[in-house]
Amino acid sequence: MAELSPMMQQYLEIKKQHKDEILFYRIGDFYEMFFDDALTASKELDLTLTGKQCGLEERAPMCGVPFHSYEGYVARLIAKGYKVAICEQVEDPAKAKGLVKRDIIRVVTPGTVIESSMLQDDRNNYIASIFLKDGAAGLCFADVSTGTAHITELKQSKIASAVITELCRYHPSEVLMNPGLLDCREITTYIKKNMTCSVELMEEERYAPGLVSIALENQFGRDWAAQTGIAPKGLVRFAMAALLEYLHDTQIKGVERLKTVISYNEAQFMRLSPVTRANLELTETLRGREKRGTLLWVLDKTSTAMGKRMLRSWIEQPLVSSAAINRRLNAVESLVHQTVQRGDLIEELHYISDLERLMTRTVYGSATPKEIYAMAQTCERLPSLKQQAESCNCPELAELSAQIDALDDIKQKIYAAVDPEAPSTLKDGGVIAKGYHPEVDELRSIRDNTKGVLAQLETRLRQETGSPKLKIGFNHVFGYFIEVSNSYKSMVPETYIRKQTLTSGERYITQELKELESKILGAHERLIALEHRLFSELLETIGGQLDRIQRTANAVAELDVLAALAQVAAENNYCRPVVDDSDELHIVEGRHPVVEQVLKGSLFVPNDTTLNCGEDRCLIITGPNMAGKSTYMRQNALIALMAQIGSFVPAAECHVGVVDAIFTRIGASDDLSAGQSTFMVEMTEVAEVLKNATSKSLVVLDEIGRGTSTFDGMSIARAVVEHISDPSKGLGCKTLFATHYHELTDLEGTIAGVKNYNIAVKKRGEDITFLRRIIRGPADDSYGIEVAKLAGLPGSVTRRAHEVLRALEASAPKNKVEQMDFDALQEYASPAVPSEMMEQLEALDVETLTPIEALNFLYELKKTLKGSLNS
């Protein structure tokens, strides 16, 4: 029976430990894949499938990729949902006795990527770890590429909604979850349907309290609770420990880079539901999912990769502390008014490399010589950057300046050690600077002088053989060789040993040449090995300064974002908003930040807005389609959000009382895959608003009640307005409510705080012009037929529509909608539910209830209700 070759036995032994990953198995200058991995990789990567003798009767399917360009292939597999295990040769093949030793150096997953070629500069790459138990959750979001983790604990009745909100805040590319999370269908369904991330179900054993404590202690020390802010008995410790164990399993080394742990409370940030994030197009457009056309696109004038990531996180996480917001605004205002300093600051920032991610690769030992030299060049700019920030005479900027370490010792160390012309890889040497290490200089002298020796030998051999074109060459197969053309090969001495026949001549070696080769290659190999060692020592030295460099990187990133916001404000004539803890949203000549940029060269019509929790609580906005209602409502939400990230806003004047959340319901959308119509999707989203909004929220609702009968839709729309705007019946929060139900305009004067506004329209005959101005009062018409005409409907259709409209108006005169008399409706109300039943329901723990317990509970509930009705 056929037996596997030793190498294939080694391959299968390693593969047995990594069944779920595609194994990249290093052989020489290639990463090879075999058997099923080869079949998968050849299909997904369009690689040629070949075969290799493996000791069996049939050849093993095989394909491979060059080791120097493997990252692109790994990135493509990761994007398709695969994980990749990298198996390296862990000893020098030239010195190996028998089979070369190989081992897994890391497993690449979507959330553990650190290679710059596989990451996007302008966004963090988070891996999330969630631990859900008893209606509470511990969450950890870590970016392995920057070494930062954000942790929080959620304890509330609407736990699923809260977890989803946090997932949308960080957009993880990979999610680790405990088995208990499988019971929460709302979260798992949302991840599956709406998030393009990999999901890893962790074993229950990973969460054993003893193992959790060991994992945290190994990473952060015995005082891990004080070091990280993780509560000793909180749920976050389970999430963090599971993440650390996963990183140890996949990264093998470098997990120590994950040292910066930021504990936050979700209440620190404005709540933005997934629907709101999509409707406001904060970081990607609804159509095309592109950056252009988003708020991020408008504000991103940053100069560094670190700044780009921080700006994105600010937009994703607006603040709710007026003090913290005003600190940012103070810095932006200072830079807006100091044009020269701002320009100098931005100029310096352009030369700053990505210190955050570069430090991760340094700790992992994968930073290249060219990247490390770029770090020194960045350090060269830091003193000037500090000075520019200090010169602005702004306390907030001075505070940032103080956090920037000039890193002069690191700069000097790198400049002394690394050659300015260092290549991107260590493979061929040339990395260590002249004068840094005497042995390097000595070995180079041998190598360089050998070139002269070879030239002298070549000249002598030409004379001895009479062959003027004889030359000495080198390749990795034969080493050094003598090449003689066919015209002169008859003159070659017998002492020459033929090694290869070419069409144009012959290649030989001699004893003298082999001895010289041994000296040359020995020096070269020792030189390469020494440069490897010295460069690794340099990386360890730099890695030991992790905290200093990370603190500096964070300060530089924030300086970059503030300078970018100031630049945008100056270029676009933005104003500084007044931000406080009032309930005011007062905007004079507000503009939509994105539409205004898209319409560059055209006039954007500004509009005023006054909203508060008093007399201007709910603005009912009427007017025709295409007139600008949605743009107006979105611009107000965006202005409030911009103010709360610390940005100036597109307005002449602006006063924003901090809002704790923005909720939007804009536009029609079906969810056919879930069997939901436009109306069902709309009602689900409205229900989320009504359940989660507070009196400090800003609510934007557009065309509530479509997709059902007119009376049903109108009734729902009215009930929603009453619930949101009337504090005695519901929320009493600031609301913008656009509607085609003109009957709702009669609510002004009936419900306190409701005001009518409409989009001004100019009509000439059957033609209309949208003036884009918001004015007081209800619209006098919906202009639906005129809009249809603008859309290109045939004239015969619009003329017939006018005839039908006149007939309908004549037969169905408009009736005013009166305020509902709830007292009169009480006779139709359902009987009151007994209080003891309410108490039983409130005490019920649905999460732990078994099916049989649920049936028994319902039976008892029915008995109680029947007894109550009979009494």
Outline where the language-model segments fall:
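Active-site phosphate-binding and catalytic loops of NTP-dependent enzymes
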Residues: 87, 110-119, 254, 390-396, ...
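Extended, charged helical/alpha-beta scaffold domains that provide interaction surfaces
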Residues: 455, 462-486
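Extended, charged coiled-coil "arm/hinge" scaffolds of SMC/Rad50-like chromosome-maintenance ATPases
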Residues: 502, 506-540
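Terminal-proximal interaction/regulatory segments of ATP-powered molecular machines
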Residues: 475, 842-871
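Conserved phosphate-binding elements of NTP-dependent enzyme cores
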Residues: 1-2, 9-13, 20, 539, ...
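Charged catalytic and DNA/RNA-contacting regions of genome-maintenance
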Residues: 1-334, 350, 354-363, 367-459, ...
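Charged, surface-exposed helical/loop "interaction arms" that form contiguous linear patches used
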Residues: 364, 368, 378-381, 399, ...
